[in-house]
Amino acid sequence: MYSFNGYSQEQLGIRMDNYTGMDQAWVNPAFVAASPLSFDVHLVGFGLFVEQNYGFIHNTSLLDMKKKAPNFVSAFDLDGKAAPKGHLVGDVYDSPNKKFVKFSGTLTGPSLMFKVAEQHSIGVFTNMRSAFTATKIPSVLGYYSYDNQAYKEGFTISPFKAAGAIWNETGIHYGFEIEKSNGTIAFGANLKYNSFLESGFFGLQKEMTYTKISSDSVSIDYPAVEFAITTGNINKFSFDSNTKNATIGQPSVDFYGHGFSADLGASIQIEDNGVDGYRWRAGVSVLDFGIANIKQKAEFHSSYPIPNELTLDFDDLKTAKTVKELERKISQLALGDPNASLKATSFKMGLPSAISIQGDYQFIQHLYVGGTIIQPFGLSRYNLTRTAVLAVAPRFENRYFSLTTPIILRDWKSARMGLAGRLGFISFGTDNLGSFIRKKDFTGTDFYFAIRLNAINLPNFLSGGGRKRNKHSKLGCYGF
């Protein structure tokens, strides 16, 4: 059995659903132990999350883009003229706001969960994950702001960081549920072994003064810069600035680092006679607690000791045909030695760690309102940064069908509405419904899709039915 499944950001539209099996483990592994399902097998799925505030596509949505693609023109080429009918117009923002770029995605391989003696959940899973975050990028580095800076007049650039990685995680899940007189208490854990393909980070540690000398050269005062990168594939890339020809060698799929991580969670459910299942549920969890150790084909560079001034001639830098040559040239200019910037052949970076608090209340049979808070934190100097989330998600749910409308506040300032559903063994949704249907400046999107098999009896599809405590064994398999 081979499969994949993609997760776009937090996928709150389906992860609070009691009948999505291992999907619940990614927000709180204790929820799996308290699940009404006897077993859950993921088959296929896909997901993606991307959001940024550097550029945009004018007045469009994903559905509109599907009609107009591939007719695309940039605002620079139009030079103030109206775009041809049926064309998409790309542009960049000219605003004083700091910039950010965020991307995440996951491909899940064989994933299985089953119950033992009703109170114990056991699972195995593999995920291929990718993430990139760049935050607090100074607005002066925006295209228009930078272009409008006068020559020979210095301006300041404040500190910012960026980090990215592609990695595989192989893990096991275990959870157990303790029955009380009026409900249950559950605990769960996902233990993961991570293998990293590509990763790296960049950081400007201190404020620096940047001066445009000409269109081809700049001067930088006190550039306190650090960066790290895996070199297995990037060293196979070369570029000739004269001929504009790029050469890319045969890419390799190798692991350059490893590490362990864990998701830990606990939950409590209170039941009453008014509804099947629980009346309310609360949980707390720690997610992606771990560090990546990159030790093979890895480089960590630093400008320390910080030079008083660094002058870069872009015409000279263009003669470098590989990333390695470019690194050596800048090191020679900044530190007087082409090898001085290379401080180590290994580096560490934190995974997208976060603490999460969840709540869920069943008002009447099958009608719930759930809430989730996710607050990221870092374990290292450089980290893959998760997005802070505050979400409220009303939903209708039974064994065979669910509909959820999450309202999500990201990073405590950007509100979005989502829509998600489950029809038997198919789950689908988005945490950014507006990107699909609302014409506006398009800056990113979010969607997810999954197919699974679990203990549901299809002949009873329309009869609904709620969860009965300690009745896992009576939830039948799919019937065909």
Please name every model-derived segment.
Residues 9-480:
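Subset of outer-membrane beta-barrel
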